[in-house]
């Protein structure tokens, strides 16, 4: 077969694999948003909003294009998920072409005629490797939801195929165009995910092997070192450096020359592009000219971040971190809101802050960083609000892996440490190999190519989330008799067994590649560095702590992609070995067919736990939180984590559910940008009742205030001796929340910047309470008129005993509670953990998936039954559960429910149980039976 005919067959087979993958992923996509970050990404794509740092502007732009095809708001998420399905199929397409190109170059010289056996081996190896990756656990999971990892995988596959394609034209005048295009794609990939940068070592190695006549180990090491330097320069110099220099220009043009905001940044970008273009025309030497072209195209791709800056200035409903100027954008890009882990040297969990003398005292030594600028729109200038500071620690360690002081006991359980002191280097390395490498990488790797025990997140226990082969002898030796596990685990849909066949085929592929002489060794090094950089190198960089909130296998999809190349090579190696024994074409074809059965077997195992069709749980459960709220009064609901916030945002932003309500994420409520956004109206709801000025909630101001109960007696004495003066200074009631905040906590006077009591109060507007529809305690529900009004307490009292400080979030919650005046309903999602030491639960009444703040201490009034600390409004709960809530298609036979979905199902199931129990307690057995029957459905 000549080259042109083979090329047609290769193209046809590649597109066939693309169609297979697109069909599989299209059939199994989730028809709406999935849990974790997906609802946020979909909302950001639909309205070009600003998501969490460091953002994904290019993904947003492409996603926004696809959302234009949605027939109505409920279909927006389906279009974004379908985009991911197509991108994932595109990744499979380029994987196929990469495998066939690599295998062909090992079998024949370029453009040499091929035998039928050669064609079977080449195309068959591409099919085996590509389909094995198609049906692998991690990649399929990302392919059917609206996250960035499918796009990142597509770009990884694209640039790897491009550098292989460049080899065909490397010696022509057109060859450099492929290198320049790769630079552009890498620039665009910065606007999707930084994982794509990790392809650079493989790209540089291909370039080295192709362009240099004399290949040596020293040269290969130099190429790898150069590629590592390129990654460091792009990641730690180019990306933040562009923002740094843009900031210098901005300060010059705005603060010194008096131009409007953003002028300096625009001038800097104009100068940058001018210099690059001028350099391209000035320097014609091929190496310099190509380098300038690559820098230009990298910069053009990187400028997708202008979308973040533009949309942040538009103050979109989702505008996380509000990066509306170059200084905020730099912080956004650097992910400064997240805790950073040491890489090569740093503290351990036992490290203590370093102290330095200051006068008669010692203070914590701080490392001072750069200034933090904020735009002052009244003055038209940037102002320094503070300098960045970092605590200096003693007892630092080389290659510190056990660094988080909140995880000391978990570190010890993984490292074998028992003495409670600082970790030794042996324990440090034990933790690194046992947890970070073995448990958080190799376990995921083996999930994909050996088998998976179940889809329950594991934390080291033998019954959850381990890898298994499906061969009882091997599995029982490692994990105990698997037949003794509960049926729920044995029948778990995430139980996938591949009998280690994909792994064995991949190992054969590595061996075959290694044995193919010089060219094979070169290929092996290229694929190995793609495998290493997108897998083990990420493990080194992330430095993860134990107890991750979810499994992290999605971060290593690129590494599994590289191993899929070796799986394809393994099929080629087996067939090539059979051919050398002078077997017929039929025998080789039959063996390749048997190899193809491996991905078929993988599909038979993984289909049931990757088919998300007909599953609407994330959308409906998010809507249920909002539907818990009353229809009037512009209610407010406090949320906290990803899965009790992002689905709510998605419902409100994208599908228009309950735009009269406000969602307040308490994990953001300590930040100045979020407080400002919450003060502003949104859709049909007014801002939150927060009266603080920008100066009062600015970053670094009023982060916490000390509680000084010993001052209470002095204040009471002042009110006794000088009542008029006291009232003028501290209000009529000095311990009422509004007065505490006004005269004490937010005071500019340092001596008054305290909470002078351990018991604070909030006044109760009794008429407002009666109008609000809040459930009244049983003991006063029968009263009427003035008797009822008089029975309502005048104040509620909140104890601060055993507390040393109030945080900014605490103070904001107290102010909102006081300012809502029982007219604007205030709720706390039931999934919110302990975000505050304030004890409100006695004042809670449960109406569904949220607790309502009330002025009644139901425990004292006798409404709290059993072990609960809160009351239950049976009528509202019944209405919500039976009539207002939707349940995401849970009644669909065979619907796949993963662990995250099941966890949210448990919240709903608990509601049914609580409601039935309360109805039975009230003697309403008829409705209790209806509730239980509905739950069973």
Question: Where are each of the predicted segments found?
Answer:
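Membrane-interface alpha helices of multi-pass inner-membrane proteins
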Residues: 44-47, 129-131, 179-191
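Short hydrophobic/aromatic helix or loop-helix immediately within or flanking a transmembrane segment
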Residues: 44-47, 52-78, 82-86, 93, ...
């Amino acid at each position: 077969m000549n080259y042109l005919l083979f090329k047609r067959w290769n193209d046809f087979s590649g597109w066939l694999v693309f169609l297979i993958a697109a069909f599989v992923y299209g059939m199994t996509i989730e028809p709406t948003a999935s849990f974790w970050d997906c609802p946020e990404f979909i909302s950001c794509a639909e309205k070009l909003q600003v998501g969490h740092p460091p953002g994904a502007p290019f993904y947003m732009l492409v996603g926004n294009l696809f959302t234009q095809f949605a027939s109505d708001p409920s279909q927006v998420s389906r279009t974004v998920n379908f985009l991911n399905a197509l991108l994932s199929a595109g990744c499979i397409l380029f994987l196929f072409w990469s495998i066939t190109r690599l295998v062909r170059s090992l079998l024949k010289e370029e453009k040499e005629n091929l035998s039928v056996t050669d064609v079977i081996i080449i195309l068959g190896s591409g099919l085996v490797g590509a389909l094995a990756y198609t049906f692998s656990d991690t990649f399929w999971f990302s392919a059917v939801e609206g996250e960035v990892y499918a796009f990142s995988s597509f770009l990884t596959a694209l640039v790897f195929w491009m550098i292989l394609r460049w080899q065909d034209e490397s010696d022509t005048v057109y060859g450099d165009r492929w290198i320049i295009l790769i630079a552009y794609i890498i620039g665009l990939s910065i606007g999707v995910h930084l994982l794509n940068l990790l392809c650079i070592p493989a790209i540089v190695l291909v370039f080295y092997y192709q362009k240099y006549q004399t290949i040596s180990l020293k040269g290969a090491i130099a190429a790898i070192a150069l590629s590592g330097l390129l990654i460091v320069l792009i990641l730690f110099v180019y990306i933040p450096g562009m923002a740094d220099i843009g900031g210098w220009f901005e300060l010059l043009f705005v603060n010194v020359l008096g131009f409007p905001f953003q002028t300096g940044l625009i001038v800097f970008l104009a100068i940058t592009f001018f210099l690059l273009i001028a350099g391209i025309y000035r320097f014609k030497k091929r190496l310099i000219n190509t380098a300038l072209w690559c820098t230009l195209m990298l910069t053009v791709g990187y400028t997708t971040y202008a979308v973040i800056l533009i949309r942040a200035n538009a103050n979109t409903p989702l505008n996380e971190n509000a990066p509306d100027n170059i200084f905020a954008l730099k912080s956004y890009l650097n992910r400064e809101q997240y805790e950073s882990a040491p890489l090569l040297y740093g503290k351990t969990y036992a490290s203590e802050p370093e102290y330095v003398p200051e006068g008669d005292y010692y203070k914590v030594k701080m490392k001072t960083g750069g200034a933090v600028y904020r735009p002052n729109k009244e003055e038209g200038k940037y102002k320094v609000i503070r300098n960045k500071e970092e605590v200096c620690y003693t007892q630092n360690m080389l290659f510190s892996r056990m660094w988080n002081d909140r995880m000391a006991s978990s570190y010890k359980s993984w490292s074998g440490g028992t003495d409670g002191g600082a970790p030794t280097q042996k324990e440090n390395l034990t933790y690194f190999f046992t947890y970070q490498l073995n448990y958080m990488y190799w376990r995921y790797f083996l999930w994909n190519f050996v088998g998976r025990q179940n889809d329950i997140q594991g934390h080291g226990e033998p019954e959850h989330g381990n890898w298994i082969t499906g061969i009882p002898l091997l599995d029982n030796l490692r994990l105990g008799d698997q037949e003794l596990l509960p049926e729920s685990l044995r029948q778990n849909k995430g139980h996938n067994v591949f009998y280690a066949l994909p792994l064995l085929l991949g190992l054969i592929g590595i061996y075959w590649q290694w044995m193919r002489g010089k060219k094979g060794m070169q290929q092996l090094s290229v694929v190995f560095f793609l495998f290493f950089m997108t897998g083990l190198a990420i493990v080194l960089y992330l430095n993860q702590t134990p107890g991750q909130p979810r499994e992290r296998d999605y971060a290593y999809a690129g590494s599994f992609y590289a191993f899929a190349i070796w799986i394809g090579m393994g099929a080629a190696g087996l067939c090539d070995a059979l051919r050398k024994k002078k077997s017929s074409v039929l025998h080789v074809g039959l063996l390749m067919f048997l190899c193809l059965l491996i991905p078929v077997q993988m599909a038979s195992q993984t289909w049931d736990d990757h088919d998300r069709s007909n599953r609407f749980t994330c959308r409906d459960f998010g809507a249920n939180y909002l539907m818990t709220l009353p229809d009037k009064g512009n209610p407010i609901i406090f949320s906290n984590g990803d899965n009790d916030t992002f689905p709510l945002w998605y419902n409100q932003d994208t599908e228009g559910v309950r735009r009269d309500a406000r969602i307040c994420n308490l994990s953001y409520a300590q930040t100045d940008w979020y407080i400002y956004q919450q003060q502003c109206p949104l859709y049909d709801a007014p801002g939150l009742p927060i009266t603080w000025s920008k100066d009062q909630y600015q970053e670094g101001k009023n982060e916490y205030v000390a509680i000084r109960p010993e001052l209470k007696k002095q204040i009471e004495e002042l009110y006794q001796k000088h009542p008029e003066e006291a009232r003028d200074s501290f209000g009529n009631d000095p311990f009422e929340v509004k007065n505490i905040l006004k005269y004490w906590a937010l005071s500019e006077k340092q001596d008054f910047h305290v909470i002078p009591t351990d018991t604070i109060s909030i006044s109760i507007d009794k008429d407002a309470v009666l109008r609000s529809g809040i459930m009244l305690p049983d003991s006063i529900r029968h009263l009427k008129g003035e008797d009822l009004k008089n029975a309502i307490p005048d104040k509620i009292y909140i104890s601060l005993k055993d507390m040393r400080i109030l945080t900014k979030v605490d103070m904001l919650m107290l102010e909102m509670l006081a300012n809502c005046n029982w007219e604007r309903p205030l709720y706390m999602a039931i999934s919110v953990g302990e975000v505050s030491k304030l004890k409100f639960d006695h004042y809670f009444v449960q109406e569904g998936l949220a607790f309502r703040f009330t002025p009644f201490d139901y425990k004292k009034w006798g409404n709290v039954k059993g072990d609960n600390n809160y009351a239950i409004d049976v009528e509202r709960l019944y209405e919500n559960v039976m009539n207002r809530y939707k349940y995401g298609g849970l009644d669909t036979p065979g619907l796949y429910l993963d662990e995250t979905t099941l966890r949210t199902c448990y919240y709903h199931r608990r509601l049914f149980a609580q409601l039935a129990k309360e109805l039975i307690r009230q003697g309403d057995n008829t409705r209790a039976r209806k509730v239980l029957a509905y739950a069973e459905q």
